[in-house]
Amino acid sequence: MCGIFGAVSSKDVQKDLIDGLSKLEYRGYDSAGLSLFSKSRKIKRIRCTGKVKELKKLAAITKLSGTCGIAHTRWATHGVPNLKNSHPHNFGKFSVVHNGIIENSDELKKTLINKHHKFSSDTDSEVVAHLLEHFSKKHKNLNDVLLNTFKKINGSFALAILYENEPDKIIVASNGSPLLIGIAKNANYISSDIQALANKTKEYISLEDNEFALIDKGSIELFDVRGSKISRPPLFTKQNIKKVSKNGYKHFMQKEIFEQKDIIMRVIKDRLGAEKILPNIFGPKSDVMLKSIKHVHFVACGTSYNASLVAKYWIEEVSDIMCTAEIASEYRYRTINVPKDTLFVAISQSGETADTIYSIKKAKQSNYRSVLSICNVPESTITRLSDYSYLMHAGPEISVASTKAFTSQLIALLLLATSLSRSSDSKLENKIIKQIKTLPMILTKTFELEKNMQVMAKQFKNKNHTLFLGRGASYPIALEAALKLKEISYIHAEGYAAGELKHGPLALVDKDMPVVGLMPDNNLVNQVLSNLAEVKARQGLVYIFTNKKMKLKKNDKTNIIPMPACGHYIAPLVYVIPMQLLSYYVAINKKTNIDQPRNLAKSVTVE
């Protein structure tokens, strides 16, 4: 993991390779490298730790050029981030880049070492280059070499390969990890991400599981796992990728936080009528499908999972539909019981999250009524696998820590909950639509808390632990607040249902522990106040975000952050904003890498 790009052309492709990698940088990575065929028809390789700009400098120094090459940005899974573990991995006449995990790499490595192979890295990926070289000694036919290699590999992979006996070809293969082939005039491209292809060509083929292809500048040969040729019509992307800038903001995360109001305004314009949701916003004939749903099953990871937990509260409150939410990495390995007329909903910003993709494939083999995806990237793997799709149109989210995608998911899920409620309460739809339409004005007021968050962040700078508490739909917002703080400031943070405080977390509370309570003015206010009183009794530092008017004693050290009044259903979208700002400014004070925090990747394409 994390990004693959390749090009074969009648012209020099070195700059194309660097440009392709630069468009994959947003996914997160710790090293980069490329291989190409030189004029002598031999494979030449350069690698570096750090950023693509360092690889670009290295390419200029070495004057590397060629018409056929592959490139990779790596996010470490097997082996520490260093030069020897960077891709491409070369052995014999082969050069390989790999996304995914070779699950039986240790076993394969032992077998190959016994055959006198010497390994130069700690990665699972290098095994592929050795297997290819091993089978090339036994088979003259390239397809036989490839098929025997693929049979030995257990796990997920997207592979791009150069072979010195075929110096005008890129070899690609896929199983459980996305890989696309872009088709152009006198050139063909490969990428793990449509965003790196969209400025090169609009025509592409998506490599399916257990397929491989041989690509030169003028042709693409596609094969199945048996080595039989297959034919598939190309797809066409409508994406026009523009260079994304910070527009004067210090970080992409800051920019993306402040874009949320405009995104919601677009939803109001494009998805809502005067009093009702526009027809079929979840795909053609989706309104008919939703009328038959009796259960909803959400599957997602990370921030998207937190969004699904909010949706569970909404759906069960506004309809008679039972709802469950599961972490994708757990769902894909367990035995499931699917009630009749259950809607499976997958949520992913990138549309390429490995565990979520595998969960959809599992769902497609189960007894679900339909599969719906909520995603930000058109033509992603998740949208292609789904029966219905809701595209968030939030624009590229570059920062690893998700902000605008989270609120876009919440809006989509609130619209889903409302659509499911139509049969039980016709007036409720109008009420929720009215609340959504107040959001732009309320968020304008919420962003005025930025200075408060700057002050509060200084108080958090030297803390080691933080608790976030909430009840009802505010509980998942507490989870999301904790996730944001730990992601970018590296402060240990936990989100809890406030009622669970005395069942364990209270043992952690002392005078150095900030405890943040999220308390919209609703029927749970008194319960949250009771929980926070327990914190104050242990000298904990209490911060309450609320729109309820509260009177405090002069000696009370509780910090009240006044929130703008808002409707019940939109409260999660309002209360998450100061949590994002708080995390951002704590990270500013700690001088961390905000847009690309350590050890994290934007698009998690391995399990």
Label the model's feature ranges:
Residues 1-246, 250, 262-269, 273-294, ...:
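Conserved short alpha-helical segments that host acidic/polar catalytic motifs at enzyme active sites
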Residues 67-84, 274-287, 311-347, 353, ...:
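Glycine-rich oxoanion-binding loops at beta->alpha junctions
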Residues 68, 94, 295-297, 343, ...:
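Structural motif
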Residues 153-187, 461-487, 522, 529:
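Acidic/histidine-rich
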Residues 227, 541, 554-556, 566-607:
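Generic C-terminus detector
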Residues 260-264, 268-297, 388-514, 590-607:
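Active-site phosphate/pyrophosphate-binding segments
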Residues 291-438, 471, 518-564, 582, ...:
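Glycine-rich phosphate-binding loops that contact phosphosugars or nucleotide phosphates
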